[in-house]
C-alpha cells in the first residue's frame, strides 16, 4: 500500500499558500484531517462565537477541497488518540501540519503528538506559518527572516495524486465513532453563544474584506481606527480570517504591497495620498502581528505568569474575593457606571470585535482601575474576540496590565477617551441608552484615584537595580530591534509599540 500523507489542518483552513499541504502533495496521496478536540474547545479562552466562525470556514474549505479531489476527514476526539485509530485502520502514514503558536494547552497537545509519533515511528513534518521562527536564537535576526519569508512566492493549490483502491478501502473502515459526518460539535457550541454582529467565516469573505479595504475602503483607516464608532467600517476586518487561517499572512502582506504600488501610480486620484498613508500603516501592523506571536512562541508561559518577576503577586492570583467578583461581573456585563467603558464592552459582546485602542482600554481599566488579575479578565476577553489569537492576546494583555517590564505603562482615562473618541456621545447613546437615566449605576470605582495608585505602584517597581536588570533580560528576548531603541541603555528599555487595528 502506498504510504499516505495525512495533513492535519488546525487554524489554517485554506488550500492556497498552505506549505504543509504542498509538501504532502509532493510525497504521495493526501488526506486532510480536521479534528474537533473537546478538551481545547472547552477551555476558558474558547467560545461558541469562535466555533461558529470556524465552522463556516470549515464548511467552505470542505467544498473547495471536494472540487480538487482532496478527501477531508472530520473527526471528534482527542489527539493523539485519534491518530492511533487512524494508524490501526490504514497502517503507517506521514503526518504533515503547520507549526502552531497557540495557547498553553495546544502546546502541551503538540508535545503529546510528537511523543506519540516518535514512539510509533511516524514522521511528522511541520511547516512554518505566521512567520514565527521556532527555536529563534536571537531577536536580532527576526526582522530579516520575516522579510525573506514575505518575499517568497505564494503557494498555489497543489495537484493531488488519486487515492488508491487500497487506501479508499482502508479509509472506509474507519469506525463511525472516529468521524463526524457534519459540523455538529462546533454548532452545539455556536448555539450557546449567539453573536449577531460578527463577521461570517470563510475564505471568500476574507478576500472580500481585504480587497475592499485595499481598493479604497481603507482611505480613513489612519484617521478613524481609534474610535469605536468609526473604526468598524474603516479597519480592514481581516483579523479573524488570519486567525483561523482562511487567509495567510503572506497573502495579506503581498496584496498590501501590490496595492501600495498601484496607488502610487494613481496620480491625481483624490484618495491617493490618504490611501498610501493608510496602507503603509496597515502593513506595519501585519508585521507587528507576527512580532507579538513570536513572543508567545519564544515563551509560552506568557499566558500563565507575569513576564517581569517584580510584578508577580502584586494582584490577587488566588480565588477572587467577593469584592473582586462584584467588580469583575460589572466589568463583564458592561455595568461599571462609566458609560464609555460599558458601551465598548457591549459593542464587543454584540460584534465579537472591537478596535485596538478600546480593547486596550477595557483590559487597562480592569487591571489598573479595578486591580483585577489579568488572567480572569484576559480569559473573558478571549472568549468575546472572534479573532482571538493567543500570540497577540496574552502579550497585549500583559502590556496593558503593566507586567512586561519593557513597555510603557498605559492607564487610560475613560472620561478622556470618551471625549476624544466619542465627542458627540453617539456611540454611548447607541450602546448605553440608559446612561442618562436615574437607574444607571454610579461608577464602581473612582477612576482618578485608582489610576494614581496603580501608576505609582507600577512605576515604583521599575526603579530598583534588580528590576532594571530583569527588564534588560526580557528586552533581549522579546523587544523590538527598532533603531530608536538601545538595549544597552542603563535605563530599562521601553518597547512602546502596541497598536493593532486590523
Where are these regions (language model features)?
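A general alpha-helix detector
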Residues: 95, 237-238, 252, 343-344, ...
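Helix-hairpin-helix/helix-loop-helix acidic hairpins
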Residues: 325-347
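C-terminal, helix-dominated tail/subdomain
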Residues: 310-319, 369, 380-450
Amino acid at each position: 500500500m502506498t504510504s499516505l500523507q495525512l495533513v492535519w489542518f488546525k487554524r489554517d483552513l485554506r488550500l492556497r499558500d498552505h506549505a504543509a499541504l504542498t509538501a504532502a502533495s509532493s510525497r504521495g496521496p493526501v488526506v486532510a484531517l480536521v479534528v474537533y478536540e473537546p478538551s481545547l474547545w472547552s477551555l476558558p479562552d474558547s467560545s461558541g462565537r469562535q466555533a461558529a466562525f470556524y465552522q463556516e470556514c470549515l464548511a467552505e474549505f470542505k467544498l473547495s477541497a471536494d472540487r480538487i479531489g482532496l478527501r477531508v476527514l472530520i473527526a471528534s476526539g482527542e489527539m493523539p488518540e485519534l491518530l492511533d485509530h487512524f494508524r490501526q485502520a490504514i497502517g503507517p502514514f506521514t503526518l504533515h501540519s503547520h507549526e502552531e503558536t497557540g495557547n498553553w494547552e495546544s502546546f502541551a497537545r503538540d508535545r503529546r503528538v510528537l511523543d506519540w509519533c516518535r514512539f510509533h515511528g511516524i514522521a511528522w513534518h511541520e511547516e512554518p506559518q505566521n512567520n514565527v521562527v521556532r527555536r529563534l536564537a536571537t531577536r536580532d535576526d527576526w526582522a530579516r527572516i520575516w522579510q525573506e519569508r514575505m518575499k517568497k512566492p505564494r503557494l498555489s493549490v497543489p495537484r493531488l495524486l488519486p487515492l488508491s483502491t487500497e487506501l479508499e478501502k482502508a479509509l472506509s473502515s474507519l469506525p463511525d465513532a472516529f468521524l463526524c459526518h457534519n459540523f455538529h460539535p462546533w454548532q452545539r457550541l455556536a448555539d450557546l453563544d449567539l453573536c449577531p454582529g460578527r463577521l461570517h467565516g470563510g475564505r471568500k469573505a476574507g478576500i472580500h474584506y481585504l480587497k475592499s479595504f485595499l481598493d479604497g475602503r481603507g482611505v480613513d483607516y489612519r484617521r478613524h481606527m481609534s474610535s469605536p464608532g468609526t473604526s468598524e467600517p474603516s479597519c480592514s476586518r481581516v483579523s479573524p480570517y488570519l486567525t483561523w487561517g482562511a487567509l495567510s499572512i503572506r497573502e495579506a502582506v503581498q496584496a498590501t504591497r501590490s496595492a501600495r504600488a498601484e496607488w502610487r501610480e494613481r496620480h491625481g486620484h483624490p484618495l491617493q495620498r490618504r490611501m498610501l498613508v493608510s496602507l503603509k500603516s496597515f502593513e506595519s501592523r501585519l508585521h507587528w502581528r507576527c512580532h507579538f506571536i513570536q513572543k508567545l512562541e519564544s515563551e509560552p508561559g506568557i499566558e500563565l505568569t507575569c513576564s517581569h518577576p517584580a510584578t508577580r503577586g502584586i494582584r490577587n492570583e488566588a480565588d477572587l474575593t467577593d469584592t473582586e467578583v462584584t467588580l469583575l461581573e460589572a466589568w463583564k456585563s458592561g455595568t461599571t457606571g462609566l458609560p464609555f467603558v460599558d458601551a465598548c464592552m457591549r459593542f464587543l459582546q454584540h460584534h465579537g470585535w472591537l478596535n485596538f485602542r478600546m480593547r486596550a482600554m477595557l483590559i487597562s481599566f480592569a487591571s489598573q482601575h479595578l486591580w483585577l488579575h489579568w488572567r480572569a479578565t484576559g480569559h473573558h476577553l478571549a472568549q468575546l474576540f472572534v479573532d482571538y489569537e493567543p500570540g497577540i492576546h496574552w502579550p497585549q494583555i500583559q502590556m496593558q496590565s503593566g507586567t512586561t517590564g519593557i513597555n510603557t505603562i498605559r492607564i487610560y482615562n475613560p472620561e478622556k477617551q470618551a471625549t476624544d473618541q466619542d465627542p458627540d456621545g453617539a456611540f454611548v447613546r447607541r450602546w448605553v441608552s440608559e446612561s442618562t437615566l436615574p437607574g444607571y449605576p454610579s461608577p464602581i470605582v473612582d477612576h482618578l484615584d485608582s489610576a494614581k495608585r496603580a501608576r505609582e505602584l507600577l512605576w515604583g517597581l521599575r526603579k530598583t537595580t534588580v528590576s532594571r536588570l530583569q527588564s534588560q533580560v526580557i528586552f533581549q528576548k522579546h523587544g523590538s530591534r527598532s533603531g530608536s531603541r538601545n538595549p544597552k541603555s542603563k535605563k530599562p528599555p521601553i518597547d512602546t509599540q502596541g497598536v493593532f487595528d486590523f
